Design a protein with these regions (language model features):
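Hydrophobic alpha-helical transmembrane segments in multi-pass integral membrane proteins
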Residues: 97-102, 160-168, 227-244, 285-298, ...
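C-terminal ends of transmembrane helices
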Residues: 11-22, 66-79, 129-142, 200-212, ...
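Structural signature of hydrophobic alpha-helical transmembrane segments
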Residues: 1-8, 49-66, 111-126, 185-197, ...
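Membrane-interface alpha-helices at helix entry/exit sites of multi-pass transporters
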Residues: 140-157, 161, 180-184, 269, ...
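Transmembrane alpha-helices that form the ion-translocation and gating core
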Residues: 74-142, 295-393
Length: 396
């Protein structure tokens, strides 16, 4: 395991730096590192690392979402209002509709299989989007209209919506029925996730005021609580018979947002600590995403797979455009939002192989498209954000 970690960090840093020098997204270098080191290429990563890959990726997500919360001003979100809610489900819904319309014509699959494929591909990646938006907040680009905050908030809920749809479509393909209780879990996951985060944020705020603790120790406390919140998601859902859900990741983000509101100076210091943790977490996250990608599948889809990815992205962009109707955003800012809301990585790496493991006839092509979505949209989206934000957003 130690050798595998050394390879992940050293090779990831070197290749990431090379790509940065070539003016390409460093995360592309990290994903390629994972593909090369992973089980489908050189197979240099120990099974002990691969077996906990999902947990390590979740750990990295916890770090970046906590940092997002620590930089998320609630007042900014209040100003945005309606579009923030629409961005949580409209773009993903449009992308799934696009998949249902186009995929059966290109790959001779059923409408239901196309819907399942759409639910795998539709989730935006907070791991790609959030660090870029935090950079925009630091540099004061788009902050006068709360654009980074809008996109970060939408991305955190978008995943919940898509995963519930994925569960429902999986049940239908298996020959079962859609449980309407699954859809009740969407609002309850959001509401109870936010409430739990606010309550814990309030308790931590009082605790940190009463007891003098080093900032490093505060980070350890917050991280530990975050791990517990994410771990008990399934247990809480089962406790209430699957009717009530709770989003641990949304609760984690809410803790950070509450600390930002109640103790702004502390939140700035903690954000700095988390940004240092993200240096290592980012490498682990994207290298392991790459390791989960079977590059051989990507070649199986050919040109049609690439055409499909770009076609459904157009549908997604139309969904973003619709969500931003009657806002104060100008044409350039809307274009930026459409571009920024495209990258995919973490959810696709996590659920892309599930239909194949369940023995679905469409399982292989769904995995192929999930792999392509990661390889195309994660680096391309990160690159597009990087080269366009100074041209399309106003500097405050």
């Amino acid at each position: 395991m130690l050798l595998s970690l050394a390879l992940i960090f050293l090779c990831g840093m070197i290749l990431g730096k090379i790509f940065s020098l070539l003016k390409l997204p460093s995360l592309l270098g990290l994903i390629i590192t994972g593909i090369v080191l992973g089980p489908y290429c050189l197979n240099l990563l120990d099974n002990s690392i691969l077996s906990i890959s999902a947990d390590l990726r979740e750990l990295a997500l916890i770090i970046i979402l906590t940092r997002a919360g620590l930089n998320l001003d609630i007042e900014d979100l209040k100003k945005v209002g309606r579009p923030a809610i629409l961005m949580c489900f409209v773009p993903a819904s449009f992308e799934i509709i696009g998949m249902i319309l186009i995929a059966p014509k290109l790959f001779d699959i059923s409408l239901l299989d196309a819907a399942l494929m759409g639910s795998v591909v539709a989730a935006v990646s907070p791991a790609v989007l959030v660090p870029k938006m935090l950079k925009l907040i630091d540099e004061k680009y788009g902050t006068n209209k709360s654009i980074p905050q809008l996109l970060m908030a939408g991305a955190s809920v978008d995943d919940i919506f898509v995963i519930v749809l994925f569960t429902s479509f999986t049940s239908l393909v298996k020959g079962g029925n859609i449980s309407y209780l699954d859809f009740v879990k969407i609002p309850t996951s959001i509401i109870f996730g936010l409430l739990l985060g606010i309550i814990i944020g309030f308790i931590l705020s009082k605790f940190f005021t009463k007891f003098h603790i080093r900032d490093s120790a505060k980070v350890v406390i917050i991280l530990s609580i975050s791990f517990i919140l994410v771990s008990i998601e399934t247990s809480i859902s089962n406790l209430f018979g699957g009717v009530i859900g709770i989003s641990g990741l949304l609760a984690v983000m809410s803790i950070g947002a509450y600390l930002k509101k109640s103790k702004e100076e502390l939140s700035k210091r903690l954000s700095l600590k988390y940004s240092k943790l993200w240096v290592a977490a980012e490498i682990i996250l994207f290298v392991l995403v790459g390791a989960a990608v079977n590059i051989n599948y990507a070649f199986n889809a050919g040109v049609l797979g690439i055409v499909l990815i770009f076609a459904v992205l157009i549908f997604r962009m139309l969904g973003v455009l619709l969500s931003l109707i009657k806002t104060k955003l100008n044409k350039k800012e809307r274009i930026f939002s459409m571009i920024a809301y495209c990258p995919k990585a973490t959810v696709q790496a996590a659920i892309g192989s599930i239909p194949l493991s369940l023995g679905f006839a469409s399982g292989e092509i769904i995995l192929v498209i999930a792999v392509l979505a990661i390889l195309i949209t994660a680096p391309l989206g990160a690159f597009a954000i990087e080269v366009s934000y100074k041209k399309l957003l106003e500097h405050e």
